[in-house]
Curated annotation (Swiss-Prot):
Lineage: superkingdom: Bacteria
Xref: Pfam families: Methyltransf_11
UniProt record similarity statement: Belongs to the methyltransferase superfamily.
Organism of this sequence: Mycobacterium leprae (strain TN)
Keyword annotations: Methyltransferase, Transferase
The protein's name: Uncharacterized methyltransferase ML2584
Amino acid sequence: MDTRRRVWPVAIITPHVTDVFAQRATLTRSLQLLSEFRYEQPYPARFYRALAADTVAMVGDLWLSTHGAPPVGRILLDVGSGSGYFAAAFADAGVRYIGVEPDPREMHAAGPALVPKAGAFVRASGMALPFADDAVDICLSSNVAEHVPQPWQLGNEMLRVTKPGGLVVLSYTIWLGPFGGHEMGLTHYLGGARAATRYVRKHGHRAKNDYGSSLFPVSAADGLNWAASTGVAVAAFPRYHPRWAWWLTSVPVLREFVVSNLVLVLRPR
């Protein structure tokens, strides 16, 4: 059956799931996060520490809403763990952290400063996780789905390894949003291939997030359709927006341009 037209019609299916986090999702938080984005390339440690702290808070709030207690002692699998900043932040929160990262360069990018904080790390693809079914309490993927050719295979793998009653949190950058082109800037609105060519012409090398090989056009509708097809989706909201702007997730076409980053929350049964 072709599900491309079957889009999840609402932003929140089970409102209580986001009750705690909604209190944190203020305009002040949104502006603070936005101000950090300019440091991603020149000062990545600053940017990723801020993003990691916010992610830990978001996951903790979602777990608290669904389970009535913080996720202390719970096992979290981070699909696309990168250079270890999330590991340090989750360790500080008392979460048992396992990171999965296919690129060894990313695994070592943060240097030795984070090693004492690190949990366990596995080099593997998120589209074929080397874990048994029902192995972890929480499965997180932050800004990874747009970098793999089969994002919903990644999503299905996340569901597979998460225990019934656990939590899957999948967040990704929407292609047509202002940050969809990553370091290519707004030129992605000219088309991905053209933007990639312009980047090479300007910088003399291909972008790290290279269209067609490490960056793919993933829409909000794609994610909402996939979430609906699983039967276990409980929430969807814009990651960086204040609570009063979450309604944008419900508006076709508009959401592709203004939601920017979509969070899908699922509870396996």
